[in-house]
């Protein structure tokens, strides 16, 4: 599904492509007493898409959650050059967005209202949006080819369509770093490639640092700029 044509300004611009989006230095992850990752170093630049591959239970979700600030790790994680540990909750919310692997269908909200949730870090305490916020919501729907679904509800949509709406919500959050946990998990093969192609385009054209976990080796090797293997 191609993106719609819509030209609206972004609220702000992120780091230039090629600068570090995610930096890991001596990172160690554990689940209970089991070490999942030990002394790992990696740099993922802006304007790139990287696939995280590995068997079930090797710590892919744990790593993504740690980078999002939702889990614990030793070592250092930097987002756009800044230590994750030094970021406030609001700073983190404007730096990294996270699309989980859960099937989320919000039946009583229109899709544009779901996408508008991504603007929460930028609105006032009652969540009132300005015109710039509404423009970004519209542009986010356009970028994922879902403008015509703006007033529809997710309970009447396919898994692939729902996943696009959740990606649009992450885009509306307007963060330079986007993490996705198994975004192609519930999709058939054609839709897996279509979604991965969309993520690649968003990385290259919007300058995002996109890091996602997947079991689809063909997608990872064929459409991504780099792959990261986690194997314990």
Where are these regions (language model features)?
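The feature captures the beta-strand-to-loop junction immediately N-terminal to the Walker
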Residues: 53-55
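Helix-to-loop junction immediately C-terminal to a conserved catalytic motif
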Residues: 68
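Conserved ABC transporter NBD signature motif
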Residues: 75-83
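Conserved ABC ATPase "signature" region
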Residues: 116, 131-149
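Conserved ABC ATPase signature
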Residues: 153-157
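Catalytic Walker B motif of ABC-type/P-loop ATPase nucleotide-binding domains
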Residues: 178-182
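H-loop/switch region of ABC-family ATPase nucleotide-binding domains
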Residues: 214-215
């Amino acid at each position: 599904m191609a993106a719609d044509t819509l030209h609206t300004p972004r609220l702000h611009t992120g780091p230039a492509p090629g600068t570090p989006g995610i930096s890991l230095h001596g990172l160690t992850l554990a689940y209970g007493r089991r070490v999942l990752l030990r002394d790992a170093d990696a740099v993922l630049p802006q304007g790139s898409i990287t696939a995280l591959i590995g068997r079930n239970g090797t710590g892919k979700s744990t790593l993504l959650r740690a980078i999002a600030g939702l889990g614990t790790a030793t070592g250092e994680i930097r987002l756009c050059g800044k230590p994750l540990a030094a970021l406030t909750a609001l700073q983190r919310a404007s730096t990294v967005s996270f699309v989980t692997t859960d099937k989320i269908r919000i039946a009583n909200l229109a899709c544009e209202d779901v996408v508008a949730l991504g603007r929460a870090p930028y609105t006032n305490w009652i969540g009132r949006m300005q015109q710039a916020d509404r423009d970004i919501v519209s542009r986010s729907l356009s970028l994922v080819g879902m403008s015509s679904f703006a007033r529809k509800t997710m309970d009447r949509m396919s898994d692939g369509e729902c996943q696009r709406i959740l990606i649009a919500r992450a885009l509306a959050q307007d963060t330079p770093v986007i993490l996705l946990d198994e975004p192609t998990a519930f999709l058939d093969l054609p839709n897996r490639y279509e979604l991965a192609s969309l993520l690649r385009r968003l990385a290259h054209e919007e300058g995002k640092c996109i890091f996602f976990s997947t079991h689809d080796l063909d997608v990872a090797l064929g459409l991504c700029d780099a792959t990261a293997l986690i194997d314990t």
